[in-house]
Amino acid sequence: MADPDLSSPLIHHQSSDQPEVVISIADDDDDESGLNLLPAVVDPRVSRGFEFDHLNPYGFLSESEPPVLGPTTVDPFRNNTPGVSGLYEAIKLVICLPIALIRLVLFAASLAVGYLATKLALAGWKDKENPMPLWRCRIMWITRICTRCILFSFGYQWIRRKGKPARREIAPIVVSNHVSYIEPIFYFYELSPTIVASESHDSLPFVGTIIRAMQVIYVNRFSQTSRKNAVHEIKRKASCDRFPRLLLFPEGTTTNGKVLISFQLGAFIPGYPIQPVVVRYPHVHFDQSWGNISLLTLMFRMFTQFHNFMEVEYLPVIYPSEKQKQNAVRLSQKTSHAIATSLNVVQTSHSFADLMLLNKATELKLENPSNYMVEMARVESLFHVSSLEATRFLDTFVSMIPDSSGRVRLHDFLRGLKLKPCPLSKRIFEFIDVEKVGSITFKQFLFASGHVLTQPLFKQTCELAFSHCDADGDGYITIQELGEALKNTIPNLNKDEIRGMYHLLDDDQDQRISQNDLLSCLRRNPLLIAIFAPDLAPT
């Protein structure tokens, strides 16, 4: 060993033939890649020629495999104190019951007075496309004062504020994280903004009338036309200083405040300056978030607290650069980063669609419903799978009878897809089982299905499969033709097994399989395209 000296490195560099990875950090005005890895890291599972095609049952569609992602370990919709626990909380609840009755009376009286004032302000007002006249806005001050009384009745005797709201002409759009139903009440009192809300809110008793006075922009989250119209209205009202400022909750639903989920882009497409606002609910014994807890239960718990803490922080206005004005995604990322940093929480790819999956799993009485969330924003970005399609995939997965941990084993998987054990069906399962543990999760099932579904050759292959099965060319596949077509991929099929597969592929259940039937079924069960693989590799 050489004698040590002060100038020699402690760890000697060893030469390597492997290329170094150069990481370039992009600032806000650079391209959208964020991090550029040069040279690109090559996945050893991709492009392995004939060996890959042999192992991959979908090699005739693509040489790639679905991305490997870890399990979703966080539930952003979980209320951490759904019930009364501990002696302190029980004693406090009993002591506060008389206070709760007084608060309930104050709540009802404030709601009634605010509702009547709003009805008066709206009486005879027909021109809803223009800003509300000033004298009507002055009447709405009665409703705003009533909303402060409502906050008081819920235990928010004082609310800590940090920073100040920017003037409307500086930041016409305000965005905030969304934890409870309390924030809209607070913002109505504090800012009296125009909000963007779901169409379903219009039918709520009392509340629907009040938000109509805010010249609410309604949106149906499942309608692309409705979303486009909402963006147009946001642009129109943000560009006119006579309208109130606009308030949006870009998460699209409430969370527990422990993470920040993906943002919808409606607030960022217009390209106007945005003021982010952060809301916190510091607590020890009572989580005030509106997650997996009913509204009535949450209201009762609020009524029976001595005081509920709430903090509102107005962050500096975000002025979009010229590139960000043209790129809503970058502006959204910059805003969400500012809010997440202030909250000191991580950002996830969950979205409202994950809440739909969670509610669906709860309705189906599945154990641990949070196992079925998949971070749908990433799924939609990678595979363009909609929330409704994801719920249909969940129905298929549930038919495989997952265990308490949300996992499905081979025999249950095969039964759910009407397959029998054979080399091909096992390779299909192994294609999904990226962890190689002998069981699959819903997230893995969805990613594999979405990966196959979005391959450029998928539709063409489905059409070729129909032509191959329709031996007599009459436009329909008979049960005999199906059995003949499958005998090479799934050998030794008996009549009952062929009949089960035929029933699955007959989408409209009219006892014959048309091309539309097959295409529709394979869109809902894209993994089944592998059983039509022989002689279908398009050139």
Curated annotation (Swiss-Prot):
Enzyme class: transferase
Record-listed Ca(2+) 1 binding positions: 470, 472, 474, 476, 481
pH dependence remark: Optimum pH is 9.0.
Transmembrane segments: 93-113
GO CC annotation, single: Golgi membrane
EC number: 2.3.1.23, 2.3.1.n6, 2.3.1.n7
Record-linked InterPro entries: EF-hand-dom_pair, EF_Hand_1_Ca_BS, EF_hand_dom, LPCAT1-like, Plipid/glycerol_acylTrfase
Motif window: HXXXXD motif: 178-183
GO biological process terms on file: phospholipid biosynthetic process; phospholipid metabolic process; very long-chain fatty acid metabolic process
Domain named EF-hand: residues: 426-455, 457-492, 493-528
Reaction(s) the record says it catalyses: a 1-acyl-sn-glycero-3-phosphoethanolamine + an acyl-CoA = a 1,2-diacyl-sn-glycero-3-phosphoethanolamine + CoA; a 1-acyl-sn-glycero-3-phosphocholine + an acyl-CoA = a 1,2-diacyl-sn-glycero-3-phosphocholine + CoA; a 1-acyl-sn-glycero-3-phospho-L-serine + an acyl-CoA = a 1,2-diacyl-sn-glycero-3-phospho-L-serine + CoA
PROSITE patterns membership: EF_HAND_1, EF_HAND_2
Disrupted-gene phenotype: Delayed senescence. The double mutants lpeat1 and lpeat2 exhibit impaired growth, small leaves, short roots, reduced seed setting, reduced lipid content per fresh weight in roots and seeds, and large increases in lysophosphatidylethanolamine (LPE) and lysophosphatidylcholine (LPC) contents in leaves.
Main location: Golgi
Misc. remarks from the entry: The ratio of isoform 2/isoform 1 mRNA is increased about 15-fold in the nonsense mRNA reducing factor mutant upf3-1.
Family: Belongs to the 1-acyl-sn-glycerol-3-phosphate acyltransferase family.
Domain notes: The HXXXXD motif is essential for acyltransferase activity and may constitute the binding site for the phosphate moiety of the glycerol-3-phosphocholine.
Name listed for the protein in its UniProt record: Lysophospholipid acyltransferase LPEAT2
